[in-house]
């Protein structure tokens, strides 16, 4: 998910000042923290500007960047079986240096700037590189925690030591921890809140393809993103 794909849709959702609320339906195991922040900030700012409340409804999962985005809302609802949380930062990769040695291949790197080859997967792991990455992760994690604490406030159970460790919970457990506000689905909650005659207008992202080059480029990007997304969903057993 990124701001370019959803920027116009978000603006359209807030255009009608007569709207009683904007419902944000999320099914995401995470992604870029930067894009999650961009999207969340966009929603929060428009909500304040238009004075329209936002309600998040979680489907299968709202984890990591998905939960960051969920917290852009004033309220969060989920199913009892939804997966919620994973408030943490992760970096993953592979080390291929031993494989290269086995097949007799030399790795040659030429850089201007001593840190340009930081964390190169074809070179032996460097303790200073790992330390640098860990420091960066800690700063990102602290920023993530600050945002969640700001948005959820006194609702969350800060006494729970696992809250910000990257742990994830079922919807029912998340409710008890204050990570969400209730159990329920979008249609039933909105009808209870605004009456049986409530009208729901959906805004969905649809990519357009203009030429073969663009089609091929976007197709490969979509396939790559789908594979990565599927692997992350597998982490949560979905």
Enumerate the predicted regions with their spans.
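N-terminal organellar transit peptides
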Residues: 1-79, 90-238
């Amino acid at each position: 998910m990124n701001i370019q794909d959803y920027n116009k849709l978000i603006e359209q959702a807030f255009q009608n000042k007569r709207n009683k609320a904007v419902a944000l339906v999320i099914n995401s195991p995470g992604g870029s923290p930067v894009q999650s922040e961009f999207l969340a900030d966009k929603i929060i700012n428009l909500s304040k500007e238009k004075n329209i409340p936002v309600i998040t409804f979680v489907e299968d999962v709202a984890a990591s960047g998905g939960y960051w985005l969920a917290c852009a809302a004033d309220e969060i609802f989920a199913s009892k079986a939804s997966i919620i949380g994973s408030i943490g930062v992760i970096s993953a990769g592979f080390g291929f240096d031993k494989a290269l040695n086995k097949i007799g291949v030399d790795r040659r790197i030429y850089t201007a700037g001593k840190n340009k080859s930081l964390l190169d997967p074809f070179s032996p792991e460097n303790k200073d590189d790992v330390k640098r990455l860990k420091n960066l992760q800690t700063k990102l994690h602290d920023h993530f925690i600050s945002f969640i604490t700001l948005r959820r406030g006194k609702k969350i159970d800060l006494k729970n030591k696992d809250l910000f460790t990257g742990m994830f919970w079922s919807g029912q457990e998340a409710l008890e921890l204050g990570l969400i506000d209730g159990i329920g689905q979008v249609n039933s909650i909105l009808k209870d809140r605004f009456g049986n005659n409530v009208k729901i207008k959906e805004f969905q992202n649809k990519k357009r393809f203009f030429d073969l080059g663009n089609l091929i480029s976007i197709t490969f990007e979509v396939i790559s993103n789908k594979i990565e997304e599927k692997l992350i969903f597998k982490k949560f057993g979905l």
